[in-house]
Amino acid sequence: MERPQLDSMSQDLSEALKEATKEVHIRAENSEFMRNFQKGQVSREGFKLVMASLYHIYTALEEEIERNKQNPVYAPLYFPEELHRRAALEQDMAFWYGPHWQEAIPYTPATQHYVKRLHEVGGTHPELLVAHAYTRYLGDLSGGQVLKKIAQKAMALPSSGEGLAFFTFPSIDNPTKFKQLYRARMNTLEMTPEVKHRVTEEAKTAFLLNIELFEELQALLTEEHKDQSPSQTEFLRQRPASLVQDTTSAETPRGKSQISTSSSQTPLLRWVLTLSFLLATVAVGIYAM
């Protein structure tokens, strides 16, 4: 087992986490697909898939936070009104998938792996929960508003914010000040050098779980590419933008647990755009933490 470094152990927890995750953070953000998102190339189908994964992830995270809200290893970071995203994501699921969204949203293998780890941490290693909360919530606060504006413009969504509740934190007036408060609370957590080391390692794991989501979509993209004949690929390249960014009328069948790779419903370009948005969600957000 890797022994904790003395210099990192003398740091505040917030600084130790930022330092420890630099390398894996670079892995998450250095992708050619980031350029697609920065250009506003976000499809509705791709966005729906990302939001469904986030719903499952935050549901698991917040179930474990509730379980450990009075545990001193997490209690100082309990900000349900300000931070919790499940209720907002339920609104978004209803917008994107309709009234029967609970039966319609996909639940991919990589998402299931992420959820499993969150439950393991909350159930048997609650002192590590801070790593996942830090990675997700501070990233959302840092990059969420930028991502919201890009997605809103790219998909011509209502200015009132329907479908984008996840990115809105109505109980936080000043994100910068709140992040300062959150870091200060993190630094009050009492932990041994060994526990601090495990927390920083778990933060790396959180990044790797997000990267696994990216790789899952990349695999789907590769499979989709192999299934495309030259004529089909050329047709996709020539499709007007209005057809690429279609409406949400083609819903996922109820009870479906895996993403369909049918070329008629999820063309090659959509997987590219989906992957770019996933990368941006983590990389742009956490970059500014």
From Swiss-Prot:
Residues 1-266 are cytoplasmic. This is Heme oxygenase 1. Inhibited by metalloporphyrins such as Sn- and Zn-protoporphyrins. It comes from the Eukaryota. Residues 244-261 have a biased composition (Polar residues). It holds the Pfam family Heme_oxygenase. Heme b binds at residues 18, 25, 134, 183. It comes from Rattus norvegicus (Rat). GO terms for molecular function: arachidonate omega-hydroxylase activity; enzyme binding; heme binding; heme oxygenase (decyclizing) activity; identical protein binding; metal ion binding; phospholipase D activity; protein homodimerization activity.
